[in-house]
A protein has these predicted regions:
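Structured soluble/peripheral alpha/beta segments that form catalytic or ligand/cofactor-binding pockets
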Residues: 1-377
Length: 377
């Protein structure tokens, strides 16, 4: 029960972590696009199989949603779920999807229970190989400057996975020596939450003439002696007539908390012109201390979860945070995600599983490279 302008009281309100003058049921503003979200993946180092998952909490929409699924070659199985937040306000579990914080900022557990929608399930423990790292604030406005299209904080972590994945009745044991994981957690204002508002003035940046190259890429590296380190880069460049935006960040991350920061990234990437899938290439990096480093990358296989099935950039008219009733569970199977027809439904945004060579250390890295490109040269 609420009292005046104060939100409902939750068990979390017993803790000493309040930062606004309200209960934990309430966020600092009433924007309907305010979102708290986790997104992650785990993949076999040989590219034979990967899983993707995500959970979203939309306090101002009274909704929790999530997805989980598997990618094997060009095949993909996806399960989605959505529910009313008020039915269990202190949990982001939804339908057959479960999320557990085992050790804060270190280890989480994510579960997709056996379900009636698709023959896919998993139970995975994801453990960081380096501490969680805060990225720079995601801060973007419309071209006029009157509204934030993004204003959010995000941290990421890279490491290993253990547990099991089951697809079509066949169980695969997941071991930390042969699987990697990456995950992120964000909160704030983000684009593409709910259906587009029809009576807003069109934003020129969203026009068809926009040129885009986006790369978000965490990696887990292992040296020949068995020691490990992590890496993350985020490159975003887009422009349209009269407007240009270029941003980059990232660095190498170590178990003791040290970071070696990047000040410039030059991606030299190759894409399949039929479906815009990343094939490989190089990342030329300039470090904060002036050194130059080169990472050579190759797509290990066709495996890589299409995030459009999790409603990133929408899927067949559906978007994150939309009301679908007190509980809704659905999903689908794609026999071949690489065809132009499938990409038209799913969009090109995916967790391409890549293997990377660090020319400075001789280490080999594995991870997911999320890319979005407007045109392939």
């Amino acid at each position: 029960m609420t009292h005046g302008s104060i939100g409902p009281l939750l068990a979390a309100d017993e803790s000493f972590n309040h930062q606004i003058v309200d209960t934990f049921a309430t966020v600092s503003q009433s924007d309907y696009s305010w979102t708290e979200k986790v997104c992650g993946m785990a993949a076999a180092r040989d590219g034979s199989l990967s899983i993707g998952f995500g959970f979203g909490k939309y306090a101002n929409r009274n909704i929790v949603d999530g997805y989980g699924g598997a990618s094997r070659g060009v095949q993909q199985w996806t399960v989605r779920a959505s529910r009313e937040l008020a039915s269990a306000p202190e949990s982001i579990d939804v339908g057959p999807l479960r999320y557990e914080i085992v050790e804060p900022l270190k280890t989480i557990r994510v579960i997709l229970e056996p379900n009636h929608v698709q023959p896919v399930a998993f139970d995975l423990l994801l453990e960081g190989g380096a501490p969680c790292v805060l990225e720079e604030r995601e801060d973007r406005r419309t071209l006029t400057g009157y509204r934030h299209t993004a204003n959010q904080v995000r941290y990421h972590q890279t490491g290993t996975a253990s547990g099991w994945v089951e697809v079509q009745g066949k169980r695969v044991e997941v071991r930390p020596e042969s699987w990697v994981m990456t995950r992120d957690h964000s909160w704030g204002i983000r684009p593409d939450v709910g259906l587009p508002i029809p009576d807003l003035v069109p934003d020129p940046v969203d026009g068809s003439g926009q040129k885009v190259l986006a790369v978000w890429n965490p990696l887990f590296f292992q040296l020949p002696d068995g020691s490990t380190y992590a890496f993350h880069q985020y490159f975003l460049e887009y422009s349209s007539p009269g407007f240009a935006h270029r941003r980059m960040q990232g660095g190498f991350e170590y178990a003791d908390g040290r970071r070696e920061l990047i000040v410039a990234i030059e991606p030299r990437l190759r894409f399949n012109p039929l479906n815009k899938r990343l094939l490989g290439g190089e990342f030329h990096l300039r470090m904060a201390d002036g050194r130059e480093r080169v990472l050579s990358a190759e797509a290990i296989s066709d495996t890589g979860f299409h995030l459009g099935a999790g409603l990133y950039h929408g899927f067949e008219g559906r978007h994150h945070g939309s009301w679908r009733g007190r509980l809704d569970v659905d999903g689908e199977y794609f026999a071949d995600c690489s065809t132009p027809e499938s990409v038209a439904r799913l969009n090109q945004f995916r967790d391409c599983i890549i293997r990377v060579h660090d020319h400075s250390t001789g280490a080999t890295g594995w991870g997911n490279c999320q890319t979005y490109v407007s045109a392939v040269p």
